[in-house]
Amino acid sequence: MDRKVAREFRHKVDFLIENDAEKDYLYDVLRMYHQTMDVAVLVGDLKLVINEPNRLPLFDAIRPLIPLKHQVEYDQLTPRRSRKLKEVRLDRLHPEGLGLSVRGGLEFGCGLFISHLIKGGQADSVGLQVGDEIVRINGYSISSCTHEEVINLIRTKKTVSIKVRHIGLIPVKSSPEESLKWQYVDQFVSESGGVRGGLGSPGNRTTKEKKVFISLVGSRGLGCSISSGPIQKPGIFVSHVKPGSLSAEVGLETGDQIVEVNGIDFTNLDHKEAVNVLKSSRSLTISIVAGAGRELFMTDRERLEEARQRELQRQELLMQKRLAMESNKILQEQQEMERQRRKEIAQKAAEENERYRKEMEQISEEEEKFKKQWEEDWGSKEQLILPKTITAEVHPVPLRKPKSFGWFYRYDGKFPTIRKKAKEKKKAKYDSLQDLRKNKKELEFEQKLYKEKEEMLEKEKQLKINRLAQEVSETEREDLEESEKTQYWVERLCQTRLEQISSAENEIPEMTTGPPPPPPSVSPLAPPLRRFAGGIHLHTTDLDDIPLDMFYYPPKTPSALPVMPHPPSVNSPSKVPAPPVLPSSGHVSSSSSPWVQRTPPPIPIPPPPSIPTQDLTPTRPLPSALEEALGNHPFRTGDPGHPADDWEANTHSGKPSSSPTTERSFPPAPKTFCPSPQPPRGPGVSTISKPVMVHQEHNFVYRPAVKSEVLPQEMLKRMVVYQTAFRQDFRKYEEGFDPYSMFSPEQIAGKDVRLLRIKKEGSLDLALEGGVDSPVGKVVVSAVYEGGAAERHGGVVKGDEIMAINGKIVTDYTLAEAEAALQKAWNQGGDWIDLVVAVCPPKEYDDELSSLPSSAAESPQLARKQLEAYEPVCRHGFFLQLEPTNLLLKSRERNQTDPSWRPASSAPSP
């Protein structure tokens, strides 16, 4: 029981107190209390930590840790927090007013609290207390109201209805910059000049007074001795307590003062009368003050020891308090430093503004001074304009005519006009020189002004740059660093993934006639760490468990793979007639079989610049839609200048074939069909069929295609930002997931296990195949349809193994169980579904395809959908062709040597 209480107390402390130093201080205070057993000191120390309303439940959590004899005193010293609301009604029109003051509001980040009551007023008379939190006024909640809105709400009605609950704390905030603090009611009243109450100081008699009940029936006596106090300290005191007696059981100790017995006051009672009262009754109700006269009965040695212990405890408590409050001091210092820094920035900005203003004033003064000097030297502007007009009037060209007329009219035998013209010329030259000098000075002045304006603009620009640099916060710098780290991580991830893919491709050896080797295992990347949210309830869309081939609604197509570009062939016609059918050899029939067979290639010759393509058409008559579907898939071979063609790249698994070597390629020989058994008649249920791998001729050398630089879409989706899925705050694979926390090392076995969180929008559109009871031995993704939630997420592709769904491991599930679990997880509530997948490495063809149902001939659309996946595929020297009923693996050599060999049919479709 004690361990359970201690564990619950620690959980509550961890939940309510975030600062580790304050937690340590709280535990040290409790440790010191169990050494000193002083409740008043304990409560005083606890109030330093429990200094917020949300931490008040710690007082109730500490109460079970207090011994029973101290719990009454503990309850008196701690604030009594009421859980129930109290409703009172006040008359707003009362002559004395409401009789209360409130503080707080939404703008201060706290509720509304009563901070002062007028003694004898309305609020005091109805039982309101200082430290009550006002919850409702006139029926309206005020949790989101400002102080002014609360005052206006009180004024709306004559009778004010108030609901309160007692907290015992009052918010304190001296200035807008200061953080909100809380004070207990007794501390607040004491600082305001009132009488301190409720703290329980050691000298206060009422706080240490307690009552004990003793029944003397069946006992020999009280088991204690009493003594009268000296003159300076009168009273009746317990001088000795026998061990194991009734007095020891009820908690009486040496030095306790007896204040009252059965209603009789012992404060001024005589010693004999006190003895008679204690002996007169067999049932006693005794009120005592613990330790009031302990010093009267202590020896000198005990006094010295107690003083030494008190000093040690005081030093220890001071040290613990100092350590506990160190974090608060550091926080205050940081706040002070931040305030000082802001003040310095503001001061520097003010100094810059003042300096800028002084510089501008100085520039304007210099301009005024220069203008005055210039006006003194050259006169006002109006006088400057006048000589210009005079020079224009005395210009010799326009005044030539009237002057000649005046000369002719005043002629008196002399020629005064010649002298007159000379004087006017001299005057015009003098004026032009004056104008040139003035224009030069004006030009110099304008240049000087222009330079000063440029300097002023440069200074303004520099000031703005400095201010902007100062205003850049540390958060923005951290965001910049974080974005750079993210970009670096994405580049590293892409580079690592490209290296893994290239290494996996380089490990594939050149093959001539043998079967393709198994795909190289890609070493999984170290999975990012994140806890898997197992019990999440998520939102839903039905999954179609019935095979799509049984109905004639438009099928959902898998998500489109990227088309690999090819240069247009000059000699390739739009449609080429069907290749000639080869004669049957051995057990192979060629006339009416839908199976394709390649003839031996011609003698190797250098590849032409453009290789003609051939269309494959079935020899058996089919509907026009099927002919069109099968006729639009040309056969092309790679050459050194072109990547792998579309037909060879688009295998059923969606991964292009590539080879690390570059060799010459030859045009393909005509392809024919080999025989196959007729499909069994029955209901149109799809069955699994496997590809027939027909071996090439013994003299045919397979030339691998040139290594394609275009990566499959699934690998691009895993590596880089693809489509719209990688927008801001989007993660394709969840971080922090540890696969070894869910699976054993044998289950992981080198797989790249990742956690995907897919948002439930629309339908999931994810098809599964395999199962623990299938040849595959695991649940894998067979198709990801366009427009579904899985395709929009982009983290799951065809071939991935499903290992867990919403925390449930499905590695040992059958296909039906896995589909049911996936449908149930999608139908549950919530917004997300969690899938744990093992990423499929680049591999050869190993998927399964559903067979063509018997109803395909009746529906051209359905037949086209089924036969689109039955195209022949060339992989590493093998020729793969899909059969409607089963999948066969044949080599041409085995056909010729062992006629009794027959392919085994595949397992039924799960």
Swiss-Prot record:
Composition skew (Pro residues), residue ranges: 564-582, 599-611
Where in or outside the cell it occurs: the entry states: Cytoplasm, Cytosol; Cytoplasm, Cytoskeleton; Cell projection, Microvillus
Q: Where is this region: N-terminal domain?
A: 1-86
The PTM Phosphoserine maps to: S219
Domain (PDZ) spans 87-171, 211-295, 752-839
Comment block on domains: The PDZ 1 domain mediates interaction with ANKS4B, USHBP1, USH1G, SLC4A7. The N-terminal region constitutes an independently folded domain that has structural similarity with the CCM2 C-terminus, despite very low sequence similarity.
Tell me the gene name: Ush1c
Mind telling me what this protein is named?
Harmonin
- Asked whether the keyword Isomerase is assigned, the reply is no
Q: Which residues cross the membrane?
A: none
Region annotation (Mediates interaction with MYO7B) ranges:
194-833
Function, as annotated, reads:
Anchoring/scaffolding protein that is a part of the functional network formed by USH1C, USH1G, CDH23 and MYO7A that mediates mechanotransduction in cochlear hair cells. Required for normal development and maintenance of cochlear hair cell bundles. As part of the intermicrovillar adhesion complex/IMAC plays a role in brush border differentiation, controlling microvilli organization and length. Probably plays a central regulatory role in the assembly of the complex, recruiting CDHR2, CDHR5 and MYO7B to the microvilli tips.
Tissue specificity field: Detected in stereocilia of cochlear hair cells (at protein level). Isoform 1 is expressed in the eye, cochlea, vestibule, heart, kidney, small intestine and testis; it is barely visible in skeletal muscle, liver, and lung and is absent from the brain. Isoforms 2 and 3 are expressed in the cochlea and vestibule.
Q: Which GO terms describe its biological process?
A: actin filament bundle assembly; brush border assembly; inner ear auditory receptor cell differentiation; inner ear morphogenesis; inner ear receptor cell stereocilium organization; neuromuscular process controlling balance; parallel actin filament bundle assembly; protein localization to microvillus
Residues annotated as signal peptide: none
Q: Where is this region: Disordered?
A: 563-688, 890-910
Classification via Pfam families: PDZ, USH1C_N
Q: Extract one GO cellular component term from the record.
A: synapse
